[in-house]
């Protein structure tokens, strides 16, 4: 009895606990497929009722795998080509260098415009064709030496570039006229004596000094000639006026030549040199350069370099500045004189 009584209350407690646990648990919701909507940045996004099919993802995976395989194959082929190309380059080095030299030497050769080749430029001064990265600043010249030579040629506008002969025909006429006007007094002395009589006597070189009696006679003759001129222009000349005119003509005949010491040493040196500059020897060139103003020190350099007349006519500004270490000012003056010799 005791066991029955003792065991009987146990199920009652268990049932009480079960009822209590059932009351305490919240009701579970049934999971059903629902269509959800999202509102993101002004867009209404609605989810699908069914998931995406699985076969589509497999196709995407297959495409990605095939692209990876093709990429690996291309890399392998490129590595094989890279190994073969150096061997071919070693075998054909001589042929490629010869062809490149022919392209650079032949004028007007078309430049190679390959897809992988960098662009090439041509120097405006020396005509050298080279890659663009080797050209400096303005991309016009291949080196600083070419740029400096171009600037020197532009400042003087002579020497480095040969202008058209048709453009030089008109200025030569003016140059010849200037040379005629620059004739030295020694050349005028050797001219016709009739022209010398017409020329007025310079006060620097007067004729022989007359005696006091001759001065009185000449004064009286001048007074008589003035009176005769004022009286009438149609009257014949008096013997006094005729004698005065004769004395003046004699004075003009007795005019002494101009003093050679007061002449320009440049003109004197050029008069003693041969007329053709190409026939000058080293000493003639030395005398010519020494006679120029401010070029006495440079003349020794011309003698040391053994420059004759033909070499003198071939000189340029860059030769004078670079080879002979002459400053810009004397070099430009000297080149101007050389250009005058060329034109003459």
Curated annotation (Swiss-Prot):
List of residues binding Zn(2+): 123, 126, 142, 146
Compositional bias ranges of the Low complexity kind: 234-248
Biased composition, class Basic residues, residue ranges: 173-183
Keywords: Developmental protein, DNA-binding, Metal-binding, Nucleus, Zinc, Zinc-finger
Protein's cellular compartments: Nucleus
Pfam families with a match to the protein in the record: PHC2_SAM_assoc, SAM_1, zf-FCS_1
InterPro entries documented for this protein: PcG_chromatin_remod_factors (IPR050548), SAM (IPR001660), SAM/pointed_sf (IPR013761), Znf_FCS (IPR012313), Znf_FCS_sf (IPR038603)
Residue ranges occupied by any SAM domain in the UniProt entry: 280-344
GO cellular component terms, A-Z: nucleus; PcG protein complex; PRC1 complex
Location of the motif HD1: 25-53
Entry keyword tRNA processing: no
Region: Disordered, residue numbers: 1-28, 165-269
Gene Ontology MF term list: chromatin binding; DNA binding; histone binding; zinc ion binding
Domain of life of the organism encoding this protein: Eukaryota
Zinc fingers (FCS-type) by residue: 114-148
Polar residues: compositionally biased ranges: 1-23, 216-233
Secreted is among the record's keywords: no
One GO term (biological process): negative regulation of DNA-templated transcription
Oligomer and partners: Component of a PRC1-like complex.
Function recorded in the entry: Component of a Polycomb group (PcG) multiprotein PRC1-like complex, a complex class required to maintain the transcriptionally repressive state of many genes, including Hox genes, throughout development. PcG PRC1 complex acts via chromatin remodeling and modification of histones; it mediates monoubiquitination of histone H2A 'Lys-119', rendering chromatin heritably changed in its expressibility.
Protein name according to UniProt: Polyhomeotic-like protein 2
Species: Xenopus laevis
């Amino acid at each position: 009895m005791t066991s029955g009584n003792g065991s009987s209350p146990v199920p009652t407690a268990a049932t009480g606990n079960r009822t209590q646990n059932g009351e305490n648990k919240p009701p579970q919701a049934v999971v059903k497929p629902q269509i959800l909507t999202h509102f993101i940045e002004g867009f209404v996004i609605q989810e699908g009722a069914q998931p995406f099919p699985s076969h589509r993802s497999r196709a995407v995976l297959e495409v990605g795998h095939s692209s990876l395989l093709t990429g690996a194959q291309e890399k392998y082929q490129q590595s094989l080509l890279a190994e073969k190309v150096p061997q071919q380059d070693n075998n054909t080095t001589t042929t490629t260098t010869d062809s490149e030299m022919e392209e650079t030497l032949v004028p007007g050769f078309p430049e190679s415009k390959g897809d992988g080749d960098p662009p090439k430029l041509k120097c405006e001064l020396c005509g050298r064709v080279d890659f663009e990265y080797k050209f400096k600043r303005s991309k016009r010249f291949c080196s600083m030496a070419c740029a400096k030579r171009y600037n020197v040629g532009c400042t003087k506008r002579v020497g480095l570039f040969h202008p058209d002969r048709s453009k030089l025909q008109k200025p030569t006429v003016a140059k010849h006229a200037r040379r005629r006007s620059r004739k030295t007094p020694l050349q005028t002395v050797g001219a016709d004596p009739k022209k010398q009589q017409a020329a007025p006597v310079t006060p620097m070189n007067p004729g022989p000094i007359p005696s006091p009696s001759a001065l009185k006679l000449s004064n009286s003759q001048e007074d008589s000639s003035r009176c005769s001129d004022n009286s009438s222009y149609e009257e014949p000349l008096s013997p006094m006026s005729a004698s005065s005119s004769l004395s003046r003509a004699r004075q003009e005949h007795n005019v002494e030549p101009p003093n050679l010491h007061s002449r320009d040493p440049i003109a004197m040196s050029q008069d003693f040199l041969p007329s053709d500059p190409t026939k000058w020897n080293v000493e003639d060139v030395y005398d010519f350069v020494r006679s120029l103003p401010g070029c006495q020190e440079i003349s020794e350099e011309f003698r040391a370099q053994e420059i004759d007349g033909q070499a003198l006519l071939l000189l340029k500004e860059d030769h004078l500045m670079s080879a002979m270490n002459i400053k810009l000012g004397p070099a430009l003056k000297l080149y101007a004189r050389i250009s005058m010799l060329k034109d003459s």
